[in-house]
Amino acid sequence: PVVGVKATLVDGSYHPVDSSEMAFKTAAMMAFKKGFMDANPVLLEPIASLKVTVPDKFTGDVMGDLNRRRGRVLGMNSDHHGKQVIEADIPMSELFGYNTDLRSMTGGIGLYEYEFSRYEQAPGDIQKKEVEARAAKVDKLDV
């Protein structure tokens, strides 16, 4: 979806022969496409607040995995039962398969919970990859 966009129609005219609902919709669509691209849009990705609870001996492996998944570790606290609670922000797209990977890293002991936090601008390489993937889908539909 496109968010944070405001459009104001400042001028227009009506002609009894050439004007129709379809003509106005087409004109609006063309104006939006031009204005949208002139505004240099960016792709936003959802970010989750993540808490991972793991035994002390697995902390390094889990933190390395979070970094590999583009996560930002915000802090780490001991729960005083030999476990660490790691808090991080991470793109939600990087959480696919995390349950399986965390269980593998921790021998089935690690737990995690997350919730949506906000949207952030995706890195340039991710934006490029997503735009190319969507363009390929559109090209397939045009065939």
Located regions from the model:
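Accessory interaction regions appended to the cores of large information-processing enzymes
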Residues: 1-143
